[in-house]
Amino acid sequence: MTFYLFGIRSFPKLWKSPYLGLGPGHSYVSLFLADRCGIRNQQRLFSLKTMSPQNTKATNLIAKARYLRKDEGSNKQVYSVPHFFLAGAAKERSQMNSQTEDHALAPVRNTIQLPTQPLNSEEWDKLKEDLKENTGKTSFESWIISQMAGCHSSIDVAKSLLAWVAAKNNGIVSYDLLVKYLYLCVFHMQTSEVIDVFEIMKARYKTLEPRGYSLLIRGLIHSDRWREALLLLEDIKKVITPSKKNYNDCIQGALLHQDVNTAWNLYQELLGHDIVPMLETLKAFFDFGKDIKDDNYSNKLLDILSYLRNNQLYPGESFAHSIKTWFESVPGKQWKGQFTTVRKSGQCSGCGKTIESIQLSPEEYECLKGKIMRDVIDGGDQYRKTTPQELKRFENFIKSRPPFDVVIDGLNVAKMFPKVRESQLLLNVVSQLAKRNLRLLVLGRKHMLRRSSQWSRDEMEEVQKQASCFFADDISEDDPFLLYATLHSGNHCRFITRDLMRDHKACLPDAKTQRLFFKWQQGHQLAIVNRFPGSKLTFQRILSYDTVVQTTGDSWHIPYDEDLVERCSCEVPTKWLCLHQKT
């Protein structure tokens, strides 16, 4: 798609360029919103550099605690293993298990630098020729504007590019160029430029694509015409449900311009669509609230904290600071906040109060058990690789035995340490647990009973002496069997597997049930700590407390994510905001 470009009155540096001699006029364009506009799959022998240094994000660092201890009578240096469910553990396990590989860098034949100042026609011609010689690219205009957008080049440089293109194409500028120019306008918060393009688009088009609306909304909220962004939001609703970014922009705009009622109405509308709001949206309400002395507003902020709890959401570090600032600004309440941690015992290191237990109540357990049995196990999909006959055989097997204390995913456990024979490792785990007089169930596959380099028949016979065993067909899924056996045995039963059960959690029907499942998982899944060959296996302690936003009325405890710690969805933060009222 192309457009005839006759100029825009707000582009004086473009259309009145001394290099190009173009006069004033009008142009029309459709817009889209993108997080970045870089071009992938560049030629190997070509690299891009800007003439000015680029800002880079801080490298995510995770502190690795190391300590010395005596292990079973021998002096060994042991690396502390992060708890299975604590933030950063998955990344650290990945780093510990990965092998470093050297990757040779492709040779760079030539480099082309992005301009940092407007170029004239001859300079753009030369840059285009240089690119063609180095890479063979013929789509110079599209490529260079993508790189400029990705590197957030200046508006004036982008204008000179558009002017050069217009001069060489009888006033025609492609859609792609205009789109990425507008992206730069929004990024650099050039509101007047966005407004002028908006006026032209209103005159030219009856409707826009959703991404175009999104870019206009983001560009307009900082202007005195921000309410027109709300009209664009209504236009989006005629086609699709607006995104959480659309709502975030409109809410931020409303708060920026002191329209609190509109902001809360948009927030309720967002929740009504079952959209999880951006954390920066929630943070904006707290930032705005420190200047408002209104009980109704305060109650709504407390509702946001309840929403975080019910949906197991964790604020970032900056958001946590905003929450602390708001609490301490509430007149007459004398709230005092501090950033702290929770001890292994479940006590807050700051105030000494006990954090909620990780164990489910009997009512919660029965509710979760029923929904897992119905939605995860009896739903059918989880057993698509299991025959009805085998499923029936397993159910009869479980019902014919007393409840188990520990259910072991045999194949998963056996493969935890690659340098150890699989049957030997499984026997080691079973033997240590059997010494504690625990009733054990090992779930495995039939191939584990066949003699091989990894599976000793003698060791597997010993496993069967110390534990009940069920060996499914080799194509069967293990996890549903493990869930069924553990839940059927009762709330006391634990299970061992490295699997984080993400798929099964996703099968559950609502956020509340998913939260109960994750809480149950944290309180019942045992993890084996890595160790040296020949040393005794160590089972990692189960967290005693529930990492979730919680209150006792005169105190709040809010877990939050540190800025420099990567946390996957199956992990929980280690840092807490402790808030309590002074007495």
From Swiss-Prot:
For this protein, what is the EC number? 3.1.26.5
Q: Which reaction does it catalyse?
A: Endonucleolytic cleavage of RNA, removing 5'-extranucleotides from tRNA precursor
Residue positions, PTM Phosphoserine? S98
Which pairs of positions does the record mark as disulfide bonds?
none
Modification after translation: Degraded by LONP1 following mitochondrial unfolded protein response, probably leading to inhibit translation in mitochondrion.
| Binding residues for Mg(2+) 2 | D479, D499
Query: What residues does Mg(2+) 1 bind to?
Result: D409, D478
The transit peptide spans: 1-45
Keywords from UniProt, A to Z, are:
Disease variant, Hydrolase, Magnesium, Manganese, Metal-binding, Mitochondrion, Nuclease, Phosphoprotein, Primary mitochondrial disease, Transit peptide, tRNA processing, Zinc
* BP GO terms, sorted: mitochondrial tRNA 5'-end processing; tRNA 5'-leader removal
Q: What GO molecular function terms would the record report?
A: metal ion binding; ribonuclease P activity
Q: Which InterPro entries match?
A: MRPP3_PIN_dom, PRORP_C, TPR-like_helical_dom_sf
Cofactors, names only: Mg(2+); Mn(2+)
Sequence ranges assigned to domain PRORP in this UniProt record: 342-578
- Indicate the impact reported for A434D: In COXPD54; uncertain significance
GO CC field? mitochondrial matrix; mitochondrial nucleoid; mitochondrial ribonuclease P complex; mitochondrion; nucleoplasm
Keyword presence, Aminoacyl-tRNA synthetase: no
What is its EC class? hydrolase
Conditions for induction? Down-regulated following mitochondrial unfolded protein response.
Statement: the UniProt record of this protein carries the keyword Transmembrane: no
Main location class: mitochondrion
Q: Which domain of life is it from?
A: Eukaryota
Oligomer status and interactors: Catalytic component of mitochondrial ribonuclease P, a complex composed of TRMT10C/MRPP1, HSD17B10/MRPP2 and PRORP/MRPP3.
Protein purpose: Catalytic ribonuclease component of mitochondrial ribonuclease P, a complex composed of TRMT10C/MRPP1, HSD17B10/MRPP2 and PRORP/MRPP3, which cleaves tRNA molecules in their 5'-ends. The presence of TRMT10C/MRPP1, HSD17B10/MRPP2 is required to catalyze tRNA molecules in their 5'-ends.
Q: What is known of its domains?
A: Displays a distorted and non-productive active site that probably switches to a fully productive state only upon association with TRMT10C/MRPP1, HSD17B10/MRPP2 and pre-tRNA substrate.
Q: Which named protein is this?
A: Mitochondrial ribonuclease P catalytic subunit
Native organism is Homo sapiens
Lineage, opening ranks: Eukaryota, Metazoa, Chordata, Craniata, Vertebrata
